[in-house]
Amino acid sequence: MQWTPEHAQWAEQHFDISSTTRSLAHKAEAYRGHLQRTYQYAWANDDISALTASNLLKKYAEKYSGILEGPSERALLCSYSESAPGLLNGRKSESDAWQEGIYPMSCAADVISASKTGMTPALPPPDVTASVGSSTGVASSLSEPSYSSSNCGNHASALHSGIPSQEFASSYNGSYLHSTYSGGQSTPALPSPHPSPLHSAGLLQPPPPPPPTLVPSYNTSSPNLSSYNYPPAGYPPQTPVAPGYSPGGAPPPSAYLPSGIAAPTPLPPSTIPGYSYQSHNHAPIAPTPLNGSSANTLKRKAFYMTGQGDMDSSYGNFNYSQQRSAQSPMYRMPDNSLVDSTRGNGFDRNADTSSLAFKPTKQSMPTDQQRKFGSQAGRALTPPSYGSSKGSLGSMRSGESFGKFGSPVMSDHGDDSRQHLPHSIDTATSSSHPAEEQLKNSDANLVEMVTTEILQQTSPVDWSDIAGLEMAKATIKDEVLWPILRPDMFSGLATLPRSILLFGPQGTGRTLLGRCMASQLGAAFLLLSGSALVTKWLGEGEKIVQASFLIARCRQPSVVFISDVDLLLSSQLSEESPVNRIKSELLLQLDGVLSSPEEHVLVVCSTSKPEEIDESLRRYFVKRLLVPLPDATARHQIISQLLSQHNYCLSDKEVTLLVQRTDGFSGLDVVRLCQEALVGPLHGMPGADLSGMIPGQMRPVSYQDFENVFCKIQPSISQKELDTYTEWNKMFGCSQ
C-alpha cells in the first residue's frame, strides 16, 4: 500500500481524540479531520463501499455530537433537562442556572423596521420553529426548547409572541442541504448584531459564497433514501439561511466530489411536498448513497445512458423483437405521438428519441438521401401490451400509433410529402375507426373469449429458437418481413405480402415460424385453429373469425395465424355444410386485408394437406412456403438442447448415432423420442424407492434408454406424403 500524507494524520488524530488533556474544541477538530481527510477522501476515491462510508459517518457523527453535548470545564447553561442528555449518550449534564433573566434585544426592533420597509416580503408564518439540536441524528423525538434561526434574541423569541418573527421557514428534506438552496427566489437573511455562542466560540466562521457545482437532489419523496440522518461533520463556512428549502429542489453542493469530475445535471424538482422544519446553520454533509446504488452512480454518473450495444439482430436497426418489450427504448413512441400515453398499446411514449435505435421521428437527411427515399414517411412499430385490459380493445386506435409498417425516414417537408404517400398516417387512422365501432357493437362475451383464447400471450420467439429450416427462414426474412419493415426499399413490388401459406408435414414448426414473425414485427399474435372452428365452435365460427380480425385491426400491427386452413377452404365442402359460413367469412376478411394495404395485419395460414385447398383460393396467398422435415443439423440441435436440461451419459459418437437413426423424423417426433428416453431410468423401479427418491439420485440417461424407445416411436410421416409435398411445392410453391 502506498504511503500518502493522509496516513500521517492517523496517529496525531488518534492522540487528539483519546487524550484526556485535550479540550473539547480540539477533539471536535480531530473528528472533523477524520471525516474530511479519511472518510471523504476514501469514499470519493472508491477505497471503501457506500455501506462502510455510511457506517463511518454514523460513528463519527455520534462521537462528534457527544463531545459537543458532553460535560467540560465550562458547564452548559440550561441546555437540556437532566434526563434528555442521559437518554442520548449516557452523559450527565451539570448545568448551571442562567445568571440573569430574560431581557429584550435591539435586533427585534431592527426586524420590525426591516419588515416594514419590504426588505423581506412574503415571509412564512412564525409558527414553524425548530431547535438548535433538532437534528434527526441527535434528538428528533424529544421535546426541546425552541430557538429561532436568527442569531439574536433566541432565548427571548418564545416570550415575545407579539413581535413579528423573522424566522425563515424551510421545507426540510431529510438531510442537511446547503442553506442557500431554495425552490423559489432566495431572500437574503438579515445580519445579526449579536453573534451566537457558536460564533463567539470560534466553531462557526464567516460564510463564503455557495459552491457553483451541484449534484442531484435527494428529497423525502424518494423511497430509497436512507432512513437515518446524522449531524453535520463540522461547521465549515457557509452562507446565511435563506427562506425555504424546497422539497426535492436545488441539490446540495458537490464539495464531496473529487476534483476534476464534472457534476451531474440537477434533477427536476419533486412535486411531493416536504415536511417543514426550521432551518439550521449547519454545514452540508455528503448524502448517503441511495439503497441499491453504488457510490460511483452518485459521484460519477452525469446522465442516464441507454445501453444499445447489446441490441444485435439480423435486422440491424430495424429489429422489432418483443424480447426487449417495454424496457427497451426501441419500442417507445416519441413525445409527439398522435396518441397520448393512456391509449394505444400501453407502452411508454416518453423515451428520449436520441436513444432510439430505430428513430420514429423526423430526421434531417442530405439532399441525395431525400431523393433516394423519395420522401417516404413512416413510424416505428410498437409491440402490443399483452397485459392490457380486455375492456380497452374497443378504445384503441392503433392506426394512430402506427402510421405504417415501414420506413422511419421522413424528410424535412414531412407534412407536404404526406399527400404523395400511398399509405399515409391519416388514412391508417381513419381506416381503424370502422373496426373500432364494429368491435364496440360486438358481443362482449365473444370479444372476451377471443381475447383470452385466441389472442396469445406467450414469450417472444427468436430465429435461433427454431432448429433448422434455414431456407424457410431466409425466404420469410427476404420476401415477407423486409418488404413490410422497409416498404420504401421495395417500392417496385406490385403488392406487399399480406398473406402467407405454410405447408408441410405435421410437427415441423409452422406455428413456431408464425410466432417468430409476430415477434420480429413486434405484433400481436392471434392463433385460430381450423379444426376447432369446424368442431368446437361450429355454431358461431363465422362470428369468431369476424371478431378475431376486428381485434387484429384494433391491435395493429398484428399477425393472424390460422392452422388447418384446408378444413375451411376445402374444395369438397357441400353447399349445405355449416362450414361454408365460416369459409365465406374468412374469404371476406382476407379480401379486406389484401385490399387495404394501409392496414398492418399479416395473415399466416398453415396446412399439412395443401392439395385439398380449392384451386381458385390459392390466389389469396401471395407466398406459399414449404416447411420440410428437420435435417441432420437441426435434429442434432434438438437432441442436444433437450439432453442439456437433464443428467445423461452419452458420448458424442452416441449422439451422432441418434441423429442418424432419427432420419425421417419430424421435429415433434424427435422431441417425443427424447422425452420417452428421459423417463427411462424411472421404468422398472419399485414404487417405494421412487417415493423416497430425489431428482439428483436418479441415474443418468444412457443410450440404452433411447434404444428401448426406438421400438415404440417411428416416423409419423410416410415417404408417400413427403413426395406429395415435394410435387405440390414444385407446382405451386414459392420458396424453393
Swiss-Prot record:
Binding-site list for ATP: A467, G507, T508, G509, R510, T511, L512
GO biological process: anatomical structure morphogenesis; cell division
Alphabetical list of SUPFAM superfamilies matching this protein: P-loop containing nucleoside triphosphate hydrolases
Region (Disordered): 118-155, 180-248, 272-295, 341-438
Keywords: ATP-binding, Cell cycle, Cell division, Cytoplasm, Cytoskeleton, Microtubule, Mitosis, Nucleotide-binding, Nucleus
Stretches with biased composition (Polar residues): 352-368
CDD domains: RecA-like_fidgetin
Residues spanning the membrane: none
Gene3D superfamilies assigned: 1.10.8.60, P-loop containing nucleotide triphosphate hydrolases
Biased composition (Low complexity): 128-150, 216-232
Family statement drawn from the similarity comment of this UniProt entry: Belongs to the AAA ATPase family.
Function: ATP-dependent microtubule severing protein. Severs microtubules along their length and depolymerizes their ends, primarily the minus-end, suppressing microtubule growth from and attachment to centrosomes. Microtubule severing may promote rapid reorganization of cellular microtubule arrays and the release of microtubules from the centrosome following nucleation. Microtubule release from the mitotic spindle poles may allow depolymerization of the microtubule end proximal to the spindle pole, leading to poleward microtubule flux and poleward motion of chromosome.
Protein name, as recorded: Fidgetin
Protein's gene: fign
